[in-house]
Amino acid sequence: MSKFIPEGETYHVPSFQWMFDQTLESDSHHDEAIFVTESINESGVDTSVEITADGTLASYMHAVKPLVEDGLLNPPFDQARWGLCCKNVVDVYDGLLGYRLIPMAEAARMLYLEIDGSFVDESECDDWRPVDTSDGFTEAMFDVMNEIPGEETKNTCALSLEAESRQAPETSDMVPSEYTLADRYVTTREEFASVDSDYDISLNLVSPVEFRVGVCEDTYRHSEADDPTMPQYHDRISLKSLEAAGHHMLPTHAYFDDTYYQALEELGDYNVDISKLSVRQSDVDWYRDPEKYYEPELSIGSFQRRIGTQKTVLTALKKRNADVPELADSVDIKRVACEVAEKFKRAYLNHSGIGLLGQSMDVMSRGLEYHKKWKDHKDLTGVTVLSEINLQRYQHMIKSDIKPVVSDTLHLERAVAATITFHGKGVTSCFSPYFTACFEKFSKALKSRFVVPIGKISSLELKNVPLSNKWFLEADLSKFDKSQGELHLEFQREILLSLGFPAPLTNWWCDFHRESMLSDPHAGVNMPVSFQRRTGDAFTYFGNTLVTMAMMAYCCDMNTVDCAIFSGDDSLLICKSKPHLDANVFQSLFNMEIKVMDPSLPYVCSKFLLETEMNNLVSVPDPMREIQRLAKRKIIKSPELLRAHFESFCDRMKFLNKLDEKMINLLCKFVALKYKKPDVENDVRVAIAAFGYYSENFLRFCECYATEGVNIYKVKHPITQEWFEASRDRDGDWFHDWRNPKFPTALDKVWRFFGKYARDDPMKHIEERDRRHRLNRAMNSSLKLAYDRRSLSKDKETVAWVRKTLSK
């Protein structure tokens, strides 16, 4: 026997007769005797029914074969769970059509009973592979040779049977035509192309083979990345990506820090050239405590809070009020003023609304509104007592917040603070109702083509104003306030009289604007000015708007303008044809330096105007300016103040949700054209996405500043530049308020005994009478008089009530 045959077993010589005689293969008795076995049906289920996984009770009984005990099934039948298991199996098998899998019912049973295992049928899979020793003839070839014509082989695979049972019946014999790549890419032309190193075509690299190729064009371009109508996706917004975008847009603003600029200005030498000036000792402390303000996370050219010291005020006066340009020629002021006022009236006022100008102004109702505002808070600070006041004397101050710089000059020139010249609250409250009522009359007679965003129409969002195929005129008037002279004052007088403003008030207002005195009591600076605009009185915005409209009407034909927006010294003209503006008249007649932007864009009041699908206009703030406002350094550490800045930020970004991809793409091109920077379009997209992200809620906005949550603040170490949480309780903090009841403690009393601490109350041993005198002298005189008058009125009421009671 062979060593491969175990003892006790006989070796049968295999017969290959079946390869030539089909009768041996189809012996039914032989097949039944060997391969068919009878299964014992313990659950009483009819096994002759085809096993499927359709979620019914019958399929559950056939697949799971539960035991029946006292009428209950074990495991119990849960129809919802069994149906979900069957559905999951069908979904999985639809995606695994190329694999040999176990029957669906068995897979559903494994999921239902939570049995671990694989759905792949590995019963006939092994690592053994037969060695091909044939001479080219296979079993399939013999089957084809011996196939009986007209006889169909029936597929008995369980998976195929289940797939056939789930097939939906065809309702139509027509096959629908579907969209293919051949329909999308169409060959439009043919040309000859060469292949430099195609070895499959030719080995002659000196003279490469040229062959005809078809040039295809994509008929469905909406899925391309550069299509302007498709959205472009970016990474998640972060402070690092936003700061990188800001540094790329404004390279000179990167890591700008002016912490020590105020100290350098105060400690260095100073030279100023002003013709007439009065200077005395200043009482302003230029030190700025950095621990009182939020530290922004971004470093994109934001400025520190500017303090109005004497040198800072002199620098601001030098730029904003001194050195008035003298560009105009000698003209007849009275005649030219009448001509300008007449052109203003013909260009802007409607003929049907001129009759409204003769009506009386509703001044009393406007004065009542101001009185109600004062009554709500009853703030007596700055209220003028009924006495004689010099209207030619103006108070002066500087703006602590510096306007964002959008030019690449931050490394060469320090931005100068803007100045504010204003009357007291008493004078302003007296004149404001008159100018408010005058503007209401003016707006009723104004043509609808011209828009002045103030009051109830303060928004730049306009309806039915298309921007497509239009020309724009964007003019920049530099040195606008101090360039105004006597001519501007005179045609303002004529315009106010034509609008129905009372003549005595008009003449009075214009007369005390001829010569005025600017006074800054804290900085100790006084300077006389003449004719130029006062930047903080009751007529500032309305007057600047009237001056701009009058000069534009005199130098440009307003009949060709479809729409015009005027706001202070900002203006924007929208025309069907290219507008013509005589810039020489601005210089020779109105003493103004004007610069017409090229190209002129729909840009006004630091906002871009974009057109929606319904031909409406929405305004979007300038991203170059807003990205710097996210890094303000003047916000005091207070959750209420930080929330106020957040609400202001949300108000400016209220139209971001109306922007579609076309409008965003247009905005990016507008920014690139305005600032002559063609490579900032992607940075503008990052900035817009950041504006939408940080305007979602207050906590996201707090991420822009050194805060942890809302009420806990982080502090940066001045040397290690690390963030840490520190306590703010120091001995010096207790002495700021000598009325503090917590100080001193027992230990502090011991230290005071040895002379380390000073007294709590420096006025403790002073008599009550002397103390009251010192406190009253320290108070503001107008505030003291107001309090005294209020106390006197109460005393008079008390005396009158006592007398009335005694008389009864």
From Swiss-Prot:
Protein name according to UniProt: RNA-directed RNA polymerase 2a
Q: Subunit structure of this entry?
A: Interacts with replication protein 1a.
Known EC number: 2.7.7.48
GO biological process terms, semicolon-separated: DNA-templated transcription; positive stranded viral RNA replication
SUPFAM superfamilies per record: DNA/RNA polymerases
**Reaction catalysed by this enzyme:** RNA(n) + a ribonucleoside 5'-triphosphate = RNA(n+1) + diphosphate
Query: What are the entry keywords?
Result: Nucleotide-binding, Nucleotidyltransferase, RNA-directed RNA polymerase, Transferase, Viral RNA replication
What is a single Pfam family found in this protein's UniProt entry? RdRP_2
- Report the GO molecular function annotations: nucleotide binding; RNA binding; RNA-directed RNA polymerase activity
Main EC class the enzyme belongs to:
transferase
Q: Where is the RdRp catalytic domain?
A: 470-583
Q: Which organism is it from?
A: Cowpea chlorotic mottle virus
Q: Which family does it belong to?
A: Belongs to the ssRNA positive-strand viruses RNA-directed RNA polymerase family.
CDD domains membership: Bromoviridae_RdRp
Going by the entry's taxonomy, the superkingdom of the source organism is recorded as Viruses
Protein task: RNA-dependent RNA polymerase which replicates the viral genome composed of 3 RNA segments, RNA1, RNA2 and RNA3.
